[in-house]
Amino acid sequence: SSTCIPSGQPCPYNENCCSQSCTFKENENGNTVKRCD
């Protein structure tokens, strides 16, 4: 029903991503955020 989250966008869970994979990544500010792979 809901559209999947594209690669590189913030995500809560793996299932939300088009790739079915949401992992912690470091951004420019050095903060760690979960984004779709």
Curated annotation (Swiss-Prot):
Record site feature (Critical for insecticidal activity), residues: P10, N27, R35
Keyword Secreted in annotation: yes
Molecular function (Gene Ontology), one example: calcium channel inhibitor activity
Disulfide bonds: C4-C18, C11-C22, C17-C36
Alphabetically ordered keywords of this record: Calcium channel impairing toxin, Disulfide bond, Ion channel impairing toxin, Knottin, Neurotoxin, Secreted, Toxin, Voltage-gated calcium channel impairing toxin
Record has rRNA-binding as a keyword: no
GO biological process assignments: defense response
SUPFAM superfamilies: omega toxin-like (SSF57059)
Tissue expr: Expressed by the venom gland.
One cellular component (GO) term of this entry: extracellular region
Compartments reported by the entry: Secreted
Domain of life assignment: Eukaryota
Location, primary (coarse class): secreted
Protein family: Belongs to the neurotoxin 08 (Shiva) family. 01 (omega toxin) subfamily.
Record comment regarding domains: The presence of a 'disulfide through disulfide knot' structurally defines this protein as a knottin.
Function statement: Inhibits insect, but not mammalian, voltage-gated calcium channels (Cav).
Listed name of the protein: Omega-hexatoxin-Hv1c
Organism in which the protein naturally occurs: Hadronyche versuta (Blue mountains funnel-web spider)
